[in-house]
């Protein structure tokens, strides 16, 4: 998986995109063939995949959290399935947020584990089976739409309304993971997050393909306003600009903005620079939930930064508040149909 998306991916296609187009054609053929012909193994519970069309953040993790809360409201025991990207463990593991650190299991699984049972596994089928063994009656898979070898009952593709598909090219010329038409064929529905019109084209394509789509927005949790406060904002996520816009929407004045690589663990020197700059300029330090969990469990400067930083937490809020429950219900029905079909053909 590519963790660092070149900036030109998110602008109108230029000479770099066209230069890489032959490689994109080859990559797209391979990715499309895998999606169309991959054998997907089955588990006994519904599987919802929260994915996206492109490399980088679109809001998958907060969407997965929203779906888990909807599942729990229905009396279900959801379980999250993740590859544990950014973590060092390469064995199937139940994530314990009280004992594991992001360096071992990845930052996103640590966030997910605070909400529900979470398993990381390089082989998603093994992870899904472990979740079932642990009592999960619904699996929410964070990413893996294009590559997982696991039967999916409901594939919800999240797209950011501000970034859309970027320059529209497939990796490495652009951020798109596989041919769009192939992705749409395999998708159940789309979720457009935020304002802007960059996603309008793909939404129209989805409508022509008879795929439903939902809309949602990112909402800052709580009533914590930052009006008139000067801050140092730092983020090591796929789209730090989105975080900075969120901070400014709370009324803060960003005096210093620092960006790091997605899933990147800060060095002692980087942490010291943040602390020193904030103290020298009398700035409040603000960061994301993912950056915060990467600091958690450490000592020294990292612990000091974790104590000083204010975390700006965001939730995905569906425009139709019944939509998350509807998605859960549709996944359950699809799972029943899948299981009946398997019984008839066995």
Curated annotation (Swiss-Prot):
Pathway: Glycolipid biosynthesis; lipid IV(A) biosynthesis; lipid IV(A) from (3R)-3-hydroxytetradecanoyl-[acyl-carrier-protein] and UDP-N-acetyl-alpha-D-glucosamine: step 6/6. GO terms for cellular component: plasma membrane. ATP binds at residues 54-61. Pfam families: LpxK. It is an enzyme of class 2 (transferase). Its EC number is 2.7.1.130. The keyword ATP-binding applies. One of its GO terms (molecular function) is tetraacyldisaccharide 4'-kinase activity. GO terms for biological process: lipid A biosynthetic process; lipopolysaccharide core region biosynthetic process. Keywords: ATP-binding, Kinase, Lipid A biosynthesis, Lipid biosynthesis, Lipid metabolism, Nucleotide-binding, Transferase. Transfers the gamma-phosphate of ATP to the 4'-position of a tetraacyldisaccharide 1-phosphate intermediate (termed DS-1-P) to form tetraacyldisaccharide 1,4'-bis-phosphate (lipid IVA). Belongs to the LpxK family. NCBIfam families: lpxK (TIGR00682). This is Tetraacyldisaccharide 4'-kinase. It comes from Rhizobium etli (strain ATCC 51251 / DSM 11541 / JCM 21823 / NBRC 15573 / CFN 42). The gene is lpxK.
């Amino acid at each position: 998986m590519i963790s660092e998306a070149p900036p030109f991916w998110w602008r109108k296609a230029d000479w770099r995109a066209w230069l890489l187009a032959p490689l994109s054609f080859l990559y797209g053929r391979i990715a499309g063939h895998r999606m169309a012909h991959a054998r997907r193994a089955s588990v006994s519970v519904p599987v919802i995949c929260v994915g996206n069309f492109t490399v980088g953040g679109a809001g998958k993790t907060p969407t997965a959290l929203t779906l888990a809360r909807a599942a729990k409201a229905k009396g279900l025991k959801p379980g999250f399935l993740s590859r544990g990207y950014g973590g060092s463990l390469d064995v199937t593991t139940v994530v314990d947020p009280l004992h594991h650190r992001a360096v071992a299991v990845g930052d996103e699984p640590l966030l997910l584990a605070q909400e529900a049972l979470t398993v990381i596994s390089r082989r998603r089928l093994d992870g899904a089976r472990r979740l079932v063994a642990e009592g999960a009656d619904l699996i929410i898979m964070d990413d893996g739409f294009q590559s997982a070898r696991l039967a999916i009952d409901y594939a919800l593709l999240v797209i950011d309304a501000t970034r859309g598909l970027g320059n529209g090219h497939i990796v490495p010329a652009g951020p798109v993971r596989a041919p769009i038409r192939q992705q749409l064929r395999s998708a159940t529905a789309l979720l457009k997050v935020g304002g802007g019109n960059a996603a309008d084209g793909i939404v129209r394509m989805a409508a022509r393909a008879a795929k439903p789509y939902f809309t949602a927005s990112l909402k800052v949790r709580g009533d914590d306003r930052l009006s008139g406060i000067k801050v140092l904002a730092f983020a090591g996520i796929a789209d730090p600009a989105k975080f900075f816009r969120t901070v400014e929407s709370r009324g803060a004045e960003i005096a210093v903005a620092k960006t790091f690589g997605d899933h990147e663990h800060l060095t002692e020197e980087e942490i010291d620079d943040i602390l020193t700059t904030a103290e020298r300029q009398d700035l409040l330090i603000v960061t994301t939930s993912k950056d915060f969990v990467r600091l958690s469990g450490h000592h020294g400067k990292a612990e000091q930064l974790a104590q000083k930083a204010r975390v700006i937490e965001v939730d995905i809020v569906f425009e139709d508040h019944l939509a998350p429950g509807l998605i859960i219900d549709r996944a359950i029905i699809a799972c029943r149909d899948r299981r009946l079909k398997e019984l008839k053909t066995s």
